[in-house]
């Protein structure tokens, strides 16, 4: 079966023990690795966690495929590597970028990757690397990332992600997650595409605990969608690229690696529509901590300290009384990389536009720009809806080092600090 343009089917849920077969009876019954698998398939295990993890944390999927993944020649290091591979020195300065220009030459998803910042090389199970992607051509090769799990945030253009377990179609205002090591191909449905990626080197992403919020709210498990089995039975030559410790390596296959006919497990790719996020906010006063906007989190061994949080700032009502309503001025232990999918961000009146990005490192002071601050202080505090917007944040506990390419791109705004320069002192000790 080819991965064509027909409508895609999905399975609903987060962390489920899913199962799917593209041919009836392709899944073995009652065991994982029979002496002879149905249809002459090979059984293969893809482990997303160590064997001895607690059952509640374990992730693995059994694949029943036409050709074992082990059948490949040696990988060779590619001459063309990911842009932004070289990290610059850490900087405490606040950074902001205009949208990166779309490529003029034919560029697929892999060639269009630019690493913006990172805090880990990928050789340890911790940290994150952050990328933007810019593409104008569908991939004719396949890819897998041995360094981490990929969280894709499209900003421009729809993507079809053809994975070993089936296909996902994602558009701006949706996200997709591809497990570490899973092979996939990116097809462009609109000719051009731009977006953001968090490469999670740590524990797999999961839903945050809700605490006193209760048993419902934020991103609900039923709204996450996993693919159903679809396979390619092709004997045409194809390049398979892997990312290993930050570098791209490739080999030539004599078949498609997207040849899984059936599978079962919980280590799966999935998508989520950000418009389904159940936003929580104040109905009295003050601005709650932005952790109430967490969609997914990768925890560390320290309870409550995230390796990475994926946070969104969606459309919502602002009703707080006697309150400075924008996100407050802040100095944060965590490191914040922000992007904007559409609309405007309520703490920035200008300069932060869809496709752009910003980086505020540990203890770098930030907050509303002068214009947003003045408007908020003078605002008539009627109920107000922030609409047609979607900003997001990758927040991580380790300091992010920007790449040299990110600091040298013309998209870097050299005057970012100026947005706070016109903040004036209004202090008057004689008047409360």
Swiss-Prot record:
Cofactor(s) required for function per UniProt: Fe cation
Xref: SUPFAM superfamilies: RmlC-like cupins
Binding site for Fe cation: 330, 336, 366
Molecular function GO labels: homogentisate 1,2-dioxygenase activity; iron ion binding
Gene Ontology biological-process entries: L-phenylalanine catabolic process; tyrosine catabolic process
Organism domain of life: Bacteria
Active-site residues per Swiss-Prot or TrEMBL entry: 287
Isomerase in keyword set: no
Entry's family note: Belongs to the homogentisate dioxygenase family.
NCBIfam families, per database record: hmgA
Protein name according to UniProt: Homogentisate 1,2-dioxygenase
Source organism: Pseudomonas aeruginosa (strain UCBPP-PA14)
